[in-house]
């Protein structure tokens, strides 16, 4: 693909065995890497596992000098707080491979798919207004991040 000028991107939660990343890393131009929660305990509460493996894998890819877009889903009432934004900024500034931070606002586009799969999810959050998204963006930029809305 590279010989033909085709770039390869991998979207990942980062929750994978390191050997998987080691195999795909040489074939990948950029990783779209989700960073959901900075606090390990909150990550375990909402996701079911802490974020230590995810952080390890992010650092591994950065050490491979891979281009990384740190994608941060922001959910009102869950991770739209100063502590999380400060954590994102610290993480992004500590890894040269991070090209930029992409904020992704909470949405409900996957709700119908859950129903089709027979999954029931009681989680609900407010869908943020554009003004709120801009405030998040401003907050991250004030912390020194090259942040964008996704």
Language model features by range: what are they?
Residues 125-131:
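C-terminal catalytic and target-recognition region of SAM-dependent MTase-like enzymes
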């Amino acid at each position: 693909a590279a010989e033909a000028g085709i770039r390869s991107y991998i979207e990942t939660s980062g929750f994978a065995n390191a050997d998987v990343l080691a195999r795909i890393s040489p074939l990948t131009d950029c990783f779209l890497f989700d960073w959901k929660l900075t606090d390990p305990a909150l990550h375990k509460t909402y996701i079911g596992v802490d974020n230590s493996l995810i952080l390890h894998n992010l650092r591994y890819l950065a050490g491979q000098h891979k281009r990384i877009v740190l994608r941060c889903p922001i959910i009102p009432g869950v991770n739209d707080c100063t502590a999380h934004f400060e954590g994102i900024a610290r993480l992004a500034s500590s890894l040269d491979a991070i090209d930029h931070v992409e904020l992704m606002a909470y949405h409900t586009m996957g709700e119908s798919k859950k129903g089709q799969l027979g999954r029931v999810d009681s989680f609900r959050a407010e869908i943020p207004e554009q003004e709120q998204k801009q405030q998040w963006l401003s907050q991250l930029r004030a912390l020194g991040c090259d942040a964008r809305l996704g």
